[in-house]
């Protein structure tokens, strides 16, 4: 059997293994499906060409292997010409707008989950309507403030000439963005153009250029969709808001003009002083984090207990201001309850300020850090971040009034997330937080995290709303593909399924989560009645005897009758009429989730 025929139904057969396929191969399959969908009357086998259909010679029957895309499109209704999808003004005009709008409407107009693999628990009920309304109001305020800030930055570039400043570190072309305030020396945002991503065509980093030029076979990540990092940055922020983890700075797509964008002409004309060209680029705009430092720098100043073998931590009794009886449950789980509350002193390390030098790892600070880390672990796992190290998540120390400290984490550089398949070729891309001390990871998830995430991830309404929002976000890209989007969504839901199953067991933690079998949750479309038939139909069918007026009682008349039967048996005086000619086959398309195990594994699991 050929490779193409083998791949036709690999997402339909639940017992078949997921094989390695390339992004180019899927694009070729999409072109074939698109050509077939243009002629809804002709139904031919995949191996039969147009010449064979028009020929008078009878062809031998061939086995038809329907693809998953063709199966899900059978019950779908074609969109009306007067319906169009909304467009983001920051993105601008999109190519193939008509085909894309119709595909988006078909996929997102009706997304109702009839059967879900995310079974809710009675011990963790979902949030009420009042809480959801408050969350929507806060999110609307955040969106308005973000749009106002982006407009202010665009005005600063166009009116006041405050150009963007390229960030020298990192593997992509990223720029600091400033506002209109002249006294503001700190940037207000970070802009990452689409074409200057790590694997983009105009990345200004020479290391990526060398990879693309001299090592094309090892360049890029096959599990990610090319040039979609700016959408993934925004999607990570959307997922953060949907999960209410508050780790990712607000991020969305925007278009900005600047003279400092990377100009591809400079690498061809060396030694010639070219005049800067003003370019308008599309990318992701992320709010700048103030007073945050990278995690690797933070741990260099304040190493965690057990992080370095040459750093000794001595235990002392807690200060008199702390009361162990009022310690939260999550804090007691992180320490030994048989021992009195203790303080962990870090090694003397030079700091930038006297205030920061007073910070010491205590049981309270370790508990706060553990809670923030658990949120980061679940967020990274669900969106399957393939580039999480100690250099792209940040820590902030907040000094409280009672000589205590508060720790806050933030997740940045999320562009290499949301893969369309699990890594299954060369590298596994493990999470960077797995290299933290074992005493932080080898503990179960806290009850606070279980009570927070389980009601969200087991809510059918939450998944239906999330699908609509993520579909609207990913469809902003001009190369948006419904087939690839379904694969991304299946991987995300499979990761969330593992999170739910891990949180259901109070004995499991981060280490058990990453050891779980990889899976996907595929959305299968099915037709069900829009509403159950009226009770009067069943009652009439049971009570009405077969009449003797017809020569063939089993043959129904051609014109359905609208005369009420047994109206005198009804409790009310109004007879019940039912006309079967109105919507005789009123069905709707719903989603039935199906769990599929991923058996393929990459070669190297440590990098």
Swiss-Prot record:
Renumbered residue ranges of the record's region Activation loop: 411-431
Reaction catalyzed: a 1,2-diacyl-sn-glycero-3-phospho-(1D-myo-inositol) + ATP = a 1,2-diacyl-sn-glycero-3-phospho-(1D-myo-inositol 4-phosphate) + ADP + H(+)
Annotated localization: Cell membrane; Vacuole membrane
UniProt domain PI3K/PI4K catalytic: residue ranges: 161-522
Membrane protein topology class: Peripheral membrane protein
GO cellular-component term (any): endosome
One GO-annotated biological process of the protein: phosphatidylinositol phosphate biosynthetic process
Stretch list, region Catalytic loop: 384-392
Gene Ontology molecular function terms on file: 1-phosphatidylinositol 4-kinase activity; ATP binding; metal ion binding
Entry superkingdom: Eukaryota
Key words, A-Z: ATP-binding, Cell membrane, Kinase, Magnesium, Manganese, Membrane, Metal-binding, Nucleotide-binding, Transferase, Vacuole
The keyword Glycoprotein is annotated on this UniProt entry: no
Regions of compositional bias (Basic and acidic residues) in chain numbering: 319-330
Bias (Polar residues): 73-88, 341-351
Cofactor: Mg(2+); Mn(2+)
EC numbers on record: 2.7.1.67
Miscellaneous: Present with 56 molecules/cell in log phase SD medium.
Family affiliation: Belongs to the PI3/PI4-kinase family.
Function: May play a role in endocytic and/or exocytic pathways.
The protein's assembly and partners: Interacts with LAS17.
The protein, known as: Phosphatidylinositol 4-kinase LSB6
Organism of provenance: Saccharomyces cerevisiae (strain ATCC 204508 / S288c) (Baker's yeast)
